[in-house]
Design a protein with these regions (language model features):
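Hydrophobic alpha-helical segments, chiefly the membrane-spanning helices
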Residues: 165-169
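Conserved non-catalytic scaffold segment of RNase H-like nuclease domains
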Residues: 2-8, 12-103, 149-150
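Short glycine-/acidic-enriched loop or helix-start segments at secondary-structure transitions
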Residues: 17, 111-113, 163-164
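Amphipathic alpha-helical interface surfaces
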Residues: 78, 82-86, 109, 116, ...
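Short, flexible loop segments at boundaries between secondary-structure elements
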Residues: 127-142
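Substrate-recognition/cap helix-loop segment adjacent to the acidic, metal-dependent catalytic center
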Residues: 108-126
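Conserved small/polar residues in nucleotide/adenosyl-binding loops
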Residues: 152-159
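Short helix/strand-capping connector loops at secondary-structure junctions
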Residues: 143-151
Length: 169
């Protein structure tokens, strides 16, 4: 169980945790070398239509084109159930407070977790591995390095895979 990393990606109706909601959660667990992957559940969460109707243009377009918006409207999975399913998956593979939370701009996802999935958020170590920060550093210090490996078609798993699998140009 030691040294495993928990990778997480959320899709939300917008960027403001106080007024927006989580509509999809994906989790994967890797070994410390990022060579072994255990994919967790990719859960589309039902949300009241008021949150979907009030999404800004970017989110409306992005989630419509990906098909996620239609999936959210059909989903019968509550936020609480999604939290429990995700937490149960993680508990099978990683002990409490043993892994930092890993992903792209993960500090922002963590804000949503704190509000809407507090049991899950408390399970992670307080540290983060934020791949967005690494990308910004690489862009400035090693611009020849690219991180554009797209191996999945679903939005959340793709984001996690991009975080996990940087490639060199």
């Amino acid at each position: 169980m030691e040294n495993k990393l928990i990778w997480l990606d959320l899709e939300m109706t917008g960027l403001e945790p106080q007024s927006e909601r989580i509509i999809e959660i994906f989790t994967a667990i890797t070994n410390e070398d990022l060579t072994e992957v255990i994919e967790g559940p990719n859960i589309v969460i039902s949300q009241p239509t008021e949150y979907l109707d009030n999404m800004d243009d970017w989110n409306q377009d992005h989630h419509s084109r990906s098909g996620l918006l239609d999936e959210v409207k059909k989903s019968e999975i509550s936020q609480e159930d999604a939290e429990l399913r995700t937490l149960n998956f993680i508990k099978e593979h990683v002990g409490k407070n043993k892994s930092p939370l890993c992903g792209n701009t993960i500090h922002h996802d963590r804000k949503f977790l704190t509000l809407y999935m507090p049991q899950l958020e408390e399970y992670f170590h307080y540290r983060n591995i934020d791949v967005s920060s690494l990308k910004e550093v690489a862009k400035r210090w090693r611009p020849e390095v690219t991180m554009d490996c797209l191996l999945y078609t679903s939005p959340s798993p793709r984001d996690v895979e991009e975080s996990r699998m940087p490639s060199s140009a």
